[in-house]
Amino acid sequence: MILAILVGCVGTNTDVYHGYSKSGVISSFNVTALKSRHLEMVNALRLENGRSSLKYSSSLSAASKTHAFDIARQQRAWNYGSDASSAIDRAKIAGFEGLVLGENVSETYEGEYDVLNVWFKSKIGREIILDPTATDLGLSWYQDSTGKVWWVQMIGKS
């Protein structure tokens, strides 16, 4: 009986983007909720590893959005802008006054849970996410006409 009550309390989130094959267009979902879920997942991983929580940065997210669109246009998930800009350059232009510690990028048909899992399993991605000096996180994406999502996550220290 207790198990049934607990399961009822957990509920299900029907507003989760699980990837192109399951739900289609990411833009049909609440952008704020998706970014909040991502921040919560990152903070859970950080807390499990003895790190402090990050806060959402609108300037890092703006820089991430610009880069997501740019790498989609380039058809290449990498850390360089088509104008040869770096993550540091893009964050500065977007108004971030702190230090950019790292940027994770991905091109995939997967959702935010899966892409975070991939980043966390890679040595460099994990180091960026768990940087002990980090204080800020930005996330954005661009979904092209084929359904492919170009994700960009930036971690910084304000």
For every predicted segment, state its role:
Residues 86-158:
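A well-ordered secondary-structure block
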Residues 1-3:
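Sec-dependent N-terminal signal peptides
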Residues 14-15, 153:
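Short, low-complexity, intrinsically disordered N-terminal segments
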Residues 9-12:
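N-terminal Sec signal peptide cleavage junction
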Residues 15-73:
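A short alpha-helix/helix-coil micro-patch that ends at or immediately precedes a cysteine
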